[in-house]
Amino acid sequence: MANVIKTVLTYQLDGSNRDFNIPFEYLARKFVVVTLIGVDRKVLTINTDYRFATRTTISLTKAWGPADGYTTIELRRVTSTTDRLVDFTDGSILRAYDLNVAQIQTMHVAEEARDLTTDTIGVNNDGHLDARGRRIVNLANAVDDRDAVPFGQLKTMNQNSWQARNEALQFRNEAETFRNQAEGFKNESSTNATNTKQWRDETKGFRDEAKRFKNTAGQYATSAGNSASAAHQSEVNAENSATASANSAHLAEQQADRAEREADKLENYNGLAGAIDKVDGTNVYWKGNIHANGRLYMTTNGFDCGQYQQFFGGVTNRYSVMEWGDENGWLMYVQRREWTTAIGGNIQLVVNGQIITQGGAMTGQLKLQNGHVLQLESASDKAHYILSKDGNRNNWYIGRGSDNNNDCTFHSYVHGTTLTLKQDYAVVNKHFHVGQAVVATDGNIQGTKWGGKWLDAYLRDSFVAKSKAWTQVWSGSAGGGVSVTVSQDLRFRNIWIKCANNSWNFFRTGPDGIYFIASDGGWLRFQIHSNGLGFKNIADSRSVPNAIMVENE
């Protein structure tokens, strides 16, 4: 059978109701803890924030509600394990009442422990951990394969996977574009190859024709030689003609060689012309890449690549500059301000916009000039902070460490110390030092103002505790069998009963029940009933009660 929680009860706050019922028994009012739940857990103070209207009812001094940031109120019994209501000493008389109170206090502690166990994570019928339909908060990131994984770590993994998918789709689209461009270049290259082959064939024809001219000239030379032999008899007369023919043959041979060289040049030029896309005035547009085995010299100060531009040059106080830009303006530049070997501020990298990194590390110092700031920016529902690490170990962080609040936190992993700046106050989880003064987490204060003591010790040493007051809750006469009504709950209280013999008799009560006292030669047997508001004289001997007083709580 499932355990039913009996020592904790919550009520909804509506901004109008101030009275709430206490459904459980308790030994002392200080064991009842009243807490508002909403923006935080606010523990209320008795007689300041609430009071006991009756034994089973508390009344708030203010009607709390959602407008104040609180939606529910919790009534919880927390019986002290150190503040015992009954303390036994050697030689004392064991009374049933004392034994009952001691036993009830022990039972209450056990019952509260059982309820606390029932209200926390447990084990179901199959032996598995059961969070009972509630969240597990403040869970560290998983490390090993069988660790529990927090939702934030899953979201980060999903975001990284989605980003990788988008980048892969982008690369695929770019590859598709490059493939289409390559297909176009291939078609253009095929056309150029056909044209080049045609020009090569034409050039070869020109070269063959030049060779024919060369052969014809040789034939003319042979014919002239035969004529010279035949005209040997008239050699003197024909010498001038032979010399002229030889000169003509030599000139023809030179012209043929020149024609062959020009044909070779024309073939190379045809290949060069095939690589040119177009010529616009003095601007030449190439179809493919330009390869230079040596350095590439440019007489102007830069070059364009698609929509992007790169500039080189230098002016006064900017000895050398390498700048990247586009049609809308400059994007970034690297410059050496003066010709010197000094680095420092002499070498500058300037970006006209945001710098976005995808990981990695930066070495060296980051220096911000006067008037500049270091700004961390993230989505409104994301955490952002500065984290210091030593190797793989976290040292400290400053910032908003979670994504569900706007608090600024200074946290030291090494010392476990945290300072949190909230909307209108600051919270520290350890002692807070102001000069030589110390403020403890429980509200205690230590300092020279109190003689170097803690404030509670100083007050105990310097002042006498105020005595409790008494209140008369009934007066009259209650003979045997008579039952009367009192104005306050008599259960678990220090009471005084005045009997007919004018003697006051002290008694410590428990729950509703029957009690017995001896009174100055007589005795009284009485009953407390009706949730502590009824008093009945069962029987007496010369001890008729005529007044009852209770010690104020």
From Swiss-Prot:
InterPro entries named in the record: Gp37_trimer (IPR048388), Phage_T7_Gp17_C (IPR022246), Phage_T7_tail_fibre-like_N (IPR005604)
Highest taxon of the lineage: Viruses
Pfam families per the UniProt record, alphabetical: gp37_C, gp37_trimer, Phage_T7_tail
Polar residues composition bias: residue spans: 187-197
Any GO BP annotation: adhesion receptor-mediated virion attachment to host cell
Subcellular location: Virion
Compositional bias of kind Low complexity: 234-254
Region (Disordered): 180-204, 224-261
Gene3D superfamilies: 2.60.320.30, 6.20.70.20, 6.20.80.10
GO molecular function list: identical protein binding
Cellular component, GO annotation: virus tail, fiber
Keywords attached to this entry: Host-virus interaction, Late protein, Viral attachment to host adhesion receptor, Viral attachment to host cell, Viral tail fiber protein, Viral tail protein, Virion, Virus entry into host cell
Function, as annotated: Structural component of the short non-contractile tail. The tail comprises six fibers made of gp17 trimers, 2 nm in diameter and 32 nm in length. May attach to host lipopolysaccharides (LPS) to mediate primary attachment to the host cell.
Family under the similarity heading: Belongs to the Teseptimavirus fiber family.
Subunit structure: Homotrimer. Interacts with tail components gp11 and gp12.
Protein name from the UniProt record: Tail fiber protein
Native source species: Escherichia phage T7
